[in-house]
């Protein structure tokens, strides 16, 4: 059995021969067995190239060759290398005659329990601790004990005196080490701190075999074995990095410090090339994409543009001079009229009233309803005043206004008996401009009232300034009344003093005020108007005490006579002014207020009367056939912002009194934002259906957060939840 194991180890030591693979099935030694016999090295080297060597062929060679004397021992540091060299030589014991002759060489894989004979004492130095180890030299043969058999490896141990050495013998015939690590040619080991005589041989197995054969006389024609090793040691070491160099095996690295081990060339590190020149500032600015920002909405932008235009106009010297002159003339006229002309002839007033174009609009189709009368003036260039003059006219003296109030009360009491035969109680509203419906076109150069959708303090002030526009020229101390009007939203009453009006001046400017007489003992005279430069606007409202109830409401829709003739539908307004009962009273009026015939008055009522009813609903159908419900998740668009997801809070449907649809609006709350907006339903689109069309992949941050919240809300809005939200009509 020992001979079979030695033969298998000898075959495994030859990596380059074709017969190396045949030794693999023979590698079945028994743990605990010993390998090593007193055979010369030349016998082993000569048997390796054949690949089919057995004990019978090597036996005669062992008999013929005498044992060489033991060489000098190597230093202790070379013990590991000597062990490797010795592990490569155990195949010689194949010729030991102890092996049974009846065992055929074709079946060496069968286990044998025959004990191995002890090695020759000439090869093993005497045991003596360090002195024994010092006797070992490279190439000497030792006996090792087989401890473990691992796949493609053997674990052996070697005892020398008191010292015990162990190691692993690998099968190099497969040219692969354990765990798939490739085993390559032994690297050349160079110890810088040792002389060349102490260096280890790093040639391939084939070269080593040929050299040993020459030394032992196996090749008769070449008897100089020393020069080849000198040539090997004198050659330059292989470069550390060259193409195709394999990685060194791991078992050789730990013993090869400060040595040149063949390695592949290092990988190239790609580094970006630095630009040596600095970029010009123009190219940097071109790389920055500038996007226009819409900071202001349409309303704010229009107001800013209007203010800029007014500033430009006011900057010119001529406009400043004209404005100053008009203010001085108006103040002088008021002072003059207050001092001298306290009583005005009714005849002159009647004449000036007849010259005006008067339109009376009835708010409710009842005989006792309130009537709004509008007196329009000729369109003259002098009568067109801007907002700047209105703001300037707010700073008039209040003391003069009190005098006007006293005169107005006296006049009203005096004229009350003259017009007691009046059939109905009328309220007159004097405006210098008309309302405009949202669908109407552009208007002549008169100031337009913007529709006030939301009731707040700003809109309240804009209404006041709108009622305080000025048209007429020089003023006279005409008795006026005071009226407290309240809007439908429940705002606080706005009271404004009105300048007195006088007869027509020679300049051709026409008075635009008239008086309305209302029968009743509890009438209180009040005035709504504004004291301004060259003209005034007065709103006179009366309340019939007998027909006053909480359900009555008046709608004020006003236009001039010439506009009525051209387009009756243009006069309709979408805004309603509701005057609660008991809060307004009208002054006395002259008999000329009934100058229109009843037929003409009825036609004007029918043409101008228009009311819009609004209702909050939970579900509505748009003109394009889509059904929108409260709680739906939609896409909404506001100028200056991208399409943004929102949730519908309320839906308001407005219709005219004839049943036609006026508008459909929705109050929405934006996702990822605390704000709400009111938009038309036509500007909304479903969220999930139009997601691919509206979603912008390039936007990040708050936009993505809003999209995420809207997607979660849309998933939760199932048809059942939608049905619950819309089952009750509000």
UniProtKB/Swiss-Prot annotation:
Region (Interaction with HDAC1 and MTA1): 128-346
Organism: Mus musculus
Segments for region (Disordered): 1-134, 257-276, 311-355, 409-531
Gene Ontology CC annotations of this record: nucleus
Taxonomic superkingdom: Eukaryota
Role: Chromatin-binding protein that acts as an adapter between distinct nucleosome components (H3K36me3 or H2A.Z) and chromatin-modifying complexes, contributing to the regulation of the levels of histone acetylation at actively transcribed genes. Competes with CHD4 and MBD3 for interaction with MTA1 to form a NuRD subcomplex, preventing the formation of full NuRD complex (containing CHD4 and MBD3), leading to recruitment of HDACs to gene promoters resulting in turn in the deacetylation of nearby H3K27 and H2A.Z.
Biased composition (Pro residues): 66-77, 91-108
SMART domains reported in the protein's UniProt record: PWWP
Domain PWWP stretches: 630-690
Subunit structure, interactors included: Component of a MTA1-specific subcomplex of the NuRD complex (M1HR), which is composed of PWWP2A, MTA1/2, HDAC1/2, and RBBP4/7 but does not contain CHD4 and MBD3. Interacts with MTA1; the interaction mediates the association of PWWP2A with the M1HR complex. Interacts with H2A.Z/H2AZ1. Interacts (via PWWP domain) with histone H3 trimethylated at 'Lys-36' (H3K36me3). Does not interact with CHD4 and MBD3.
Modified residue annotations for Phosphoserine: 82, 99
Gene name in the database record: Pwwp2a
Name of this protein: PWWP domain-containing protein 2A
Ranges annotated as biased composition (Basic residues): 267-276
Location of the protein in the cell: Nucleus
Composition skew (Low complexity), residue ranges: 1-15, 488-501
Molecular function GO terms recorded: chromatin binding; histone H3K36me3 reader activity; methylated histone binding; NuRD complex binding
GO biological processes: chromatin remodeling; positive regulation of transcription elongation by RNA polymerase II; regulation of transcriptional start site selection at RNA polymerase II promoter
Chain positions of cross-link Glycyl lysine isopeptide (Lys-Gly) (interchain with G-Cter in SUMO2): 188
UniProt region (Interaction with the H2A.Z/H2AZ1), positions on chain: 396-547
Record keywords, A-Z: Isopeptide bond, Nucleus, Phosphoprotein, Transcription, Transcription regulation, Ubl conjugation
InterPro entries: PWWP_dom (IPR000313)
Residue spans of biased composition, Basic and acidic residues class: 311-329, 341-354, 512-527
């Amino acid at each position: 059995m020992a001979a079979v194991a030695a033969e298998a180890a000898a075959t495994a030591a030859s990596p380059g021969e074709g017969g190396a693979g045949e030794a693999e099935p023979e590698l079945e030694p028994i743990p605990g067995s010993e390998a090593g016999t007193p055979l010369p090295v030349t016998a082993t080297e000569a048997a390796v190239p054949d690949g089919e060597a057995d004990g019978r062929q090597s036996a005669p060679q062992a008999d013929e060759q005498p044992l060489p004397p033991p060489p000098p021992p190597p230093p202790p540091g070379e013990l590991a290398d000597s062990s490797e060299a010795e592990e490569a030589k155990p195949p010689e014991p194949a010729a030991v005659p102890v092996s049974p002759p009846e065992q055929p060489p074709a079946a060496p894989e069968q286990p044998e329990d025959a004990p191995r004979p002890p090695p020759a004492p000439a090869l093993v130095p005497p045991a003596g601790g360090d002195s024994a180890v010092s006797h070992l030299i490279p190439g000497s043969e030792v006996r090792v004990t087989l401890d473990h058999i691992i796949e493609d490896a053997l674990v052996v141990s070697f005892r020398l005196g008191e010292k015990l050495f162990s190691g692993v013998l690998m099968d190099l015939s497969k040219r692969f080490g354990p765990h798939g690590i490739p085993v390559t040619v032994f690297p050349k080991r160079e110890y810088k701190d040792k002389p060349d005589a102490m260096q280890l041989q790093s040639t391939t197995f084939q070269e080593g075999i040929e050299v040993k054969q020459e030394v032992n006389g196996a090749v008769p024609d070449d008897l100089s074995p020393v020069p080849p090793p000198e040539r090997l040691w004198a050659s330059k070491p292989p470069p550390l990095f060259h193409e195709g160099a394999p990685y060194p095996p791991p078992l050789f690295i730990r013993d090869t410090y400060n040595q040149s081990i063949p390695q592949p060339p290092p990988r190239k590190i790609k580094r970006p090339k630095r630009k040596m020149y600095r970029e010009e500032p123009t190219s940097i600015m071109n790389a920055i994409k500038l996007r226009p920002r819409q900071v202001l909405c349409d309303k704010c932008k229009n107001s800013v543009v209007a203010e800029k235009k007014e500033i430009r106009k006011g900057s010119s010297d001529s406009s400043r001079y004209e404005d100053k002159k008009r203010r001085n003339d108006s103040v002088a006229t008021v002072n003059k009229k207050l001092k001298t002309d306290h009583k005005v002839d009714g005849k002159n007033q009647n004449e000036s009233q007849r010259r005006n174009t008067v339109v009376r609009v009835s708010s409710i189709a009842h005989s006792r309803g309130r009537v709004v009368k509008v007196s329009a003036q000729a369109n003259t260039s002098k009568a067109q005043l801007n907002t700047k003059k209105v703001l300037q006219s707010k700073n008039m003296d209040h003391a003069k206004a009190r005098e006007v109030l006293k005169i107005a009360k006296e006049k009203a009491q005096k004229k009350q008996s003259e017009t007691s035969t009046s059939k109905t109680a009328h309220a007159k509203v004097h405006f210098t401009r008309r309302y405009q419906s949202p669908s109407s076109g552009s208007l002549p150069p008169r100031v337009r009232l913007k529709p006030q959708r939301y009731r707040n303090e700003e809109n309240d002030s804009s209404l006041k300034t709108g009622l305080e526009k000025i048209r007429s020229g020089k003023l006279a101390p005409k008795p006026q009344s005071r009226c407290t009007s309240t809007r439908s939203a429940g705002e606080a009453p706005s009271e404004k003093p009105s300048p007195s009006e006088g007869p027509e001046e020679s300049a051709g400017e026409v008075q635009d005020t008239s008086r309305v007489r209302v029968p009743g003992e509890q009438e209180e005279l009040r005035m709504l108007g504004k004291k301004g430069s060259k003209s005034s606007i007065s709103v006179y409202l009366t309340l019939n005490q007998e027909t006053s109830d909480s359900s009555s409401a008046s709608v004020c829709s006003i236009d001039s006579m010439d506009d009525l003739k051209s387009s009756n539908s243009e006069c309709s307004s979408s805004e309603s002014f509701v005057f609660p009962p008991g809060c307004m009273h009208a002054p006395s009026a002259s008999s000329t207020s009934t100058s229109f015939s009843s037929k003409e008055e009825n036609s004007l009522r029918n043409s101008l009367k228009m009311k819009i009813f609004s209702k909050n609903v939970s579900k509505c159908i748009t003109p394009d056939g889509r059904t929108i419900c409260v709680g739906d998740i939609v896409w909404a668009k506001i100028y200056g912002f991208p399409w943004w997801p929102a949730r519908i809070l309320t839906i308001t449907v407005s219709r005219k009194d004839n049943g036609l649809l006026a508008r459909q609006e929705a109050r929405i709350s934006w996702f990822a934002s605390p704000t709400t907006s009111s938009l038309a339903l036509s500007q909304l689109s479903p969220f999930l259906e139009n997601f691919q069309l509206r979603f912008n992949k390039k936007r990040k941050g708050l936009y993505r957060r809003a999209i995420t919240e809207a997607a979660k809300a849309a998933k939760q809005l199932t048809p059942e939840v939608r049905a619950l939200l819309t089952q009750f009509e509000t």
